[in-house]
Amino acid sequence: MPGAMRQSTSNLELLTIYEVSKILGSSLDLQQTLREVLRALAYQLQMHRGRVYLVGEDNVLRLVAANGLSNEAAAQIEFRDGEGITGRILKTGMPAVVPNLAEEPLFLNRTGGREDLDEQVASLVGVPIKAAGVVVGVLTIDRISDEGPQGHFGSDVRFLTMVANLIGQTVRLHRTVAEERRFMMRETFRMQKELRPVAAPINDVVCTSPNMLEVMAQVHRVAPFKSTVLIRGESGTGKELIARAIHNMSPRKDAPFIRVNCAALPESLLESELFGHEKGAFTGAQKDHKGRFELASGGTLFLDEIGDISPNFQAKLLRVLQEQEFERVGGSKTIKTDVRLICATNLNLEEAVGHGKFRADLYFRINVVTIHLPPLRERRQDIGPLARHFVAKFAKDNGMALVMEDEALEVLNRCTWPGNVRELENCIERAATQSRDGIIRTESLSCSLNLCNSSVLFQYRTLGASVGGLAPSMGPGAINRVPPGRPGGPAAANAPKTPAMPAPVPEPAGAAAARGRPARRVVPRPLAGLRRRPAGGSGPPDPACPCPSRAPLPPQAPPPSPAAAPPPAAEVPLDEPESGSLRDRLLWAMERTGWVQAKAARLLGMTTRQVSYALRKYNIEIKRF
């Protein structure tokens, strides 16, 4: 080669290297960058049909950029280690030159495009692409000649090796950035997952107490999966709200959320509602009806109060849960379904299984992930935020300004709330309707209106009785426990014979003797809503008075003389001391009313200020719950 021509070629190669370096640093799109490099090689140095292959994570060499091929066609081309000329370059890590591709048996021609050469001769030059001494790909180009194969390709090999080194550094940089980005995304996801329990409340779930925050953390953990969830808790704790939160945070959030209250439907109707029925299956079935399992396919089915379904229907439900298929009532066609099941109950299922009222196999089928919702009395930190939430909700729904005094909130904090959050919401709504100037004060609350029997209901339930649909305590002690007043229950023999009254809450055995007082007659105090007799204790109930009056206690009878016969015991509410110091009576009243001074004052016929003064005088510490 003449010296002038060699100098011209060297200058052109230097200019091309400069252009390639600019291209490699101009874009973050690796494929687009490599295609621009191949175009520059073809334009500047007539290096045609440039190809860049990169090794994937599976060690397969894939075509990522090709001059003259579409992205779709290039994506289909790959080579194994040692396969063809390109695979051999990958395996050996050494350049390869093929002077005449038409005479090379190892040439596979997978990329095509050389059929129109006629009398021209195509030569191939390929070099490995290395990064940090490791082969990460292959760069190949074609040389087209009209005069037969060229005899010397040394300058092309040296030049392409420099280009391949630049490409290798760029590939390494892109892969490092991509790996760091994936790592940062994983770390971000992990940190978000850990911080979710203290994130913003889910929908209307208002909570700040540690035990409810743990429930929320459990909701976040279980939501992404299809596992069956059993939500347990007393009535009014918000089981449906938690079920909706699980659905809304799951991959099924855009699919239906179907709720069925199993306790509200008889067995025959429940089967039709869940499985559907065919036309003519029974009287009144005038058309085909899709069941809830069919409607909820792809979404979530929430079975509320599942502990109340009959043992007969439990067997039918078990088959659907096991096989995810069912038949409509009156039909024979098997229907497949794909539902995420969430169940809820306020009953002690373990006790029901032990008594044969709930199938053990169904219990184990639904008891996969269990979420226990604490009662409101065990999450008192939430009473204030919940009360303010319900006040704001009532104000918004009714288009008014409404606030609550701190003193009223303090009264709410001392209540036992056997009806839990639902009872609190009702209490706020009732108090809001009684407020005249948009301020909920203490006198607006049910306690001041003598309409609250929370403490009485709480004592009934904790002793094992079922009052007004409120389930007994679900703790281990609830199993095989006999409620008071029933045969075998505590103090059953001494229970007073008072018809048309709720069963009294008995005093624990030995409690009277421990206080140094003789036992006395006990008369239950009527619950709110029961009609009371007029003053004097005789005559029919007064239908116009639905709640107990705020009457003072009966006067204390003077002590009888030793010779006189003892007078009949005075009828006092529950086990109020008939005699003794004011301190004893004050302690009794505070214990009976959950340490709410306003209630204790009404029970003793005193004012709230008198009760507060007496508590300070006798140095009685107020219990906080």
Swiss-Prot record:
This is Nif-specific regulatory protein. Residues 434-582 are annotated as: Inter-domain linker. The gene is nifA. Residues 597-616 bind DNA. Residues 478-578 are annotated as: Disordered. Required for activation of most nif operons, which are directly involved in nitrogen fixation. The lineage of its organism: Bacteria, Pseudomonadati, Pseudomonadota, Alphaproteobacteria, Rhodospirillales. GO terms for biological process: nitrogen fixation; phosphorelay signal transduction system; positive regulation of DNA-templated transcription initiation. Pfam families: GAF, HTH_8, Sigma54_activat. It comes from Azospirillum brasilense. The keyword Transcription applies.
